[in-house]
Amino acid sequence: KVLEGAENIGIKLTHVYGLTEVSGPASVCAEQPGWDELPADQRAQLKRRQGVPYPLEEAVTVLDPVTMQQVPRDGETIGEVMFRGNIVMKGYLKNPKATDKSFEGGWFHTGDLAVMEPDRYVKIKDRSKDIIISGGENISSIEVEDALYRHPAVLACAVVARPDPKWGETPLAFVETKAEAT
């Protein structure tokens, strides 16, 4: 609805993604021909992705953080977003241990978990620290929040992990409903 409202008053939104460790935007959701003709909900799904490398970035990719191999471009296999290029910091001031850990394998590790779409666009699913592991399954707090936000009565929500004796963790949602909701 935000995208559609902005477009209705002549504002064209562009989604960019970056981190403190990367100077300026590191990736941009570069709009492709034909996106404007799609229904608003489909345009929003495409435009909310983190995109492709920004012109000054050497590479943005999604790698398996253990094997350092690129995940399949299937929009499903989760890996970690990693950067390489001249706009990535050289290291953390007076913290060589953190610098070494962040640059294992020659890539800057963001801590953001994502998929690589077939069209090579990156889509973040969650932060590695926020993944809920329940009975051996990885549950993205962001995906649960996205599902909750689609309900017309939901104004705001947050999903966190709750300890569980059987499953290890289970999702717990804090939901604020709209005033007019019953």
Go through the PLM ranges and name each one:
Residues 2-16, 20-121, 128-131, 144-145:
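Conserved AMP-binding/adenylate-forming
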Residues 85, 90-94, 113-182:
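AMP-binding/adenylate-forming catalytic core of the ANL superfamily
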